[in-house]
Amino acid sequence: MDSASKEETLEKLDQEITVNLQKIDSNLSFCFHKITQDIIPHVATYSEICERIMDSTEWLGTMFQETGLVNLQANAAAPVGNAPVKSLVSNNVGIFPTSAEEASRQSQTDNGPNEADSAVHVNRDVHSMFNNDSIDDFHTANITSTGQILKLPDSSDEDTGSEAVPSREQTDLTGEGHGGADDEQDESTIQRQSRKRKISLLLQQQYGSSSSMVPSPIVPNKMRKQLAHEEHINNDGDNDDENSNNIESSPLKQGHHHPKGQADDNNEGPDEEESTKEVPKPGTIIHFSTNR
């Protein structure tokens, strides 16, 4: 009984070992088939692509190295028109060599003493092209030396507004005859500015501001006399004649006019002489003429 049981166990173990070995063999065959059928072809194609990339990069490196040695003057003399295609192809091939030996030989032949001379000739041609007067693209416009000097308006003449600037023809016609008139206008402008400064200072001292032009009822006599005197000076000639006629025609003003003459004749005090002038009423606005 013991021997029979031992033989059965040995047969079972032998069968199990055989089954496992068959599984291992099948797995190895599958791996070999996968490597030979799928992996090896892909590796071969990848190696071919890498070789092509290496060749292309080597050619590009040679091309970029030789671009600095290209002689444009020699290649510009290629035939144009009905020239054969082979000659054009040969000239273009000379620009981009296919091997390093040809590149070195071309660099030796191109680097000669005539290269600097050709560059100088090219620069001269370009310079003559840009300096050619017959080219319309680089023709500059005519520049005139005549002009008109504009006179800036006076900043103090704000009431009269901006005056029209005389044209060049008018200034040419007037000529040198306006020299004295210009001097008189400058003097009158200076006088006007000085009067305005005095009045603004008086107003600022009285009210603390130079923008107020309305007198107060409590203005002292000195201030009223000064304002009336400045208003009398700034009136125009025509306005002075009309005002004098109106004053002389008025019976009230005529009554005041006679005491003034008597005061001048009798040499009375300054207070009585100034009392004959017309004093502006409180609330009136005084306008100063700035006409030249």
Swiss-Prot record:
Keyword Ribosomal protein attributed: no
Domain of life the protein comes from: Eukaryota
Bias (Acidic residues) ranges: 265-275
Residues bearing the modification Phosphoserine: S26, S118, S134, S155, S156, S200, S216, S250
GO terms under cellular component: cytoplasm; DASH complex; microtubule; mitotic spindle; mitotic spindle pole body
Region: Disordered, residue numbers: 99-118, 149-194, 227-292
Subcellular location(s) of the protein: Nucleus; Cytoplasm, Cytoskeleton, Spindle; Chromosome, Centromere, Kinetochore; Chromosome
InterPro entries xref list: DASH_Ask1 (IPR013964)
Pfam families per UniProt: DASH_Ask1
Positions carrying Phosphothreonine: T140
One biological process term in Gene Ontology: mitotic sister chromatid biorientation
UniProt KW keywords: Cell cycle, Cell division, Centromere, Chromosome, Chromosome partition, Cytoplasm, Cytoskeleton, Kinetochore, Microtubule, Mitosis, Nucleus, Phosphoprotein
Quaternary state and interactors: Component of the DASH complex consisting of ASK1, DAD1, DAD2, DAD3, DAD4, DAM1, DUO1, HSK3, SPC19 and SPC34, with a stoichiometry of one copy of each subunit per complex. Multiple DASH complexes oligomerize to form a ring that encircles spindle microtubules and organizes the rod-like NDC80 complexes of the outer kinetochore. DASH complex oligomerization strengthens microtubule attachments. On cytoplasmic microtubules, DASH complexes appear to form patches instead of rings.
Function: Component of the DASH complex that connects microtubules with kinetochores and couples microtubule depolymerisation to chromosome movement; it is involved in retrieving kinetochores to the spindle poles before their re-orientation on the spindle in early mitosis and allows microtubule depolymerization to pull chromosomes apart and resist detachment during anaphase.
Family statement: Belongs to the DASH complex ASK1 family.
Additional facts recorded: Present with 2836 molecules/cell in log phase SD medium.
Protein name, entry field: DASH complex subunit ASK1
